[in-house]
Amino acid sequence: MKQIAVMLLLSACGFALDREAFTFTNYDLQIRIEPATPLLTATGKLRLRNDSASPQRAVVLQISSTLDWKSILLANKPVQYLTQPYTSDLDHTGELSEAVVTLPREVPPKGTIELDIAYAGAVPQDATRLERIGTPKDIAAANDWDRISESFTALRGVGYVVWYPVATEAASLSEGDQISETVGRWKQRHLASSLSLRVSLATSSAAAAPALVSNGTCGAAVAEPGRNSVRSTNCNWKSLGLEPPVLVAANYALLERPPARVYHFSGSEAAASDYANVAAAAAPLVREWMGELRRPVTIVELPAETTPFETGALYLTPLRVVDTKTLEVFLTHQLAHAALVLPRAWISEGVANFLQAVQSERQAGRMSAILFMQKQLRPLIEVEKNNLATAQKSAGQAQQAASNAATSLINTTDPFLASSKGMYVWWMLRDMLGDRPLQNAFRGYRADEDREANYTPRLLAAEAQVSAPQEAAHLEQFFDDWVYRDRGLPDFHIASVYARQMLNGGFLLTVTVENLGGAAAEVAVIGRAKDESDSRRLWVPARQKATIRIPMRSQPTEAQVNDGSVPESNMANNVVPVQSNSQQ
């Protein structure tokens, strides 16, 4: 009935409901968490901006379905609103409590409003959204572990449990990547949004006060006057879209061993020490590339049988026995975020993944790094295939160009594309330019100067002009194909190959490579003989051919294009045999 009432109200007012019309530019919230109950109560103020192209008469506010709206005020006066359940897997319950607020007057494009809000309710562990698509109960519980309880509290926010108000279209786990795309779109809209939060944590006694851990900038917890069993903390987030707020609370002990802070349960002291030691061992490589860390890596122990979670420099995980080298590669990701906070996902996540590959290379050589990256290659190929198919369905050239731009690295809301393709982009740039230009660009990055999408590419170009001027000539085309537009992936094959014996001894291997794909790249071309292997790098434009000659001491037997460091749509045709003095 409530949904019908909302529809009737909207029809009467003559407007359609655009759930994502408004961006929440600032949150100023006070929340109280009572683990024994387990209740969350919240009050505060929201500032919203109409980012749509049309005047808006309605505002949508959504919270987890186990929370209830208590009041919504505009200019200190109650406003008319209707609440309804809204099916969406952005919350662990599979449903949101949605308030559709009718404003007294339209808000024009770029106009702003402020609302005072209050809501409250329990936050139990709930895996309904996973169970209804057939996930076994134990696996569902291991993934959806957000809850408020006496022993452990965790609130991960949008995409897990919506404990602060949001406004999004519905998303379903049964619809492919719809959840990650919707969350990615929300993050993109809220990159410049901030949150000021006062958290009050009630405990059974002052002696048993749990530690509150978050990924925000928080002050010390202090007891409220006359209420020693309630401790309050002020926390701030400058960019909700970059690292959405996460809160965790339990009876943790803290091990501080730079660059790590490890919050652990009683009895996990040895494991906590191991994790801190591995973080310390992984840090020198990150400092070599990024400079000094700007914040510590925070590792928080989760209850057993739960799935790890990471965001930025925060890593939540059961403290299991893990292979040291594997953990070293994993923690390199958090260390990269601790060294450099960037507002662009393809850089922040791409660089973090790239440094994991570099750490793999440091441990076991280049092929180890390539194998690490190739774990993400198959899904990347599928994503690019789907993006190109969508673009090709566009009616005209302008629409296709717009589609290519929408799924480009600088614009994508797909976190997988930003991290996986971004990782490959940084590896290819390293192969083109060398280590030093990238390291200098990372160290020279200034967040307050990063106002345009080409800021980081300009830093790289300036460095490359000094140390690798020949390769720098290809940077503009590289960024156009791989970053500013989504041209898909290259598809290399060897069009012709022959070996000629030289008069002064040895052989000259001539290899012509054709790129059937839409993205240009510099790729390795390898000549092999019985007891010899040599490699040269060749720039191959999209849908063109290029030729390279490789001198070798003995008769070449095989030629290969791409050692796996360049992602391409088809690697099944990259190796051909070589016959002396004959063209293939």
Predicted regions located by residue number:
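Juxtacatalytic substrate-recognition/specificity segment
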Residues: 248-347, 351, 355-359, 364, ...
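A surface-exposed beta-strand-loop module
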Residues: 67-140, 144, 183-187, 224-228, ...
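Beta-strand-rich binding/interaction modules
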Residues: 71-73, 206-215, 472, 489-493, ...
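Zn2+-dependent metallopeptidase catalytic core
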Residues: 44, 186, 190, 197-210, ...
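N-terminal, polar/Ser/Thr-rich
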Residues: 13-41, 70, 476-482
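Amphipathic alpha-helical substructures
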Residues: 294, 413-505
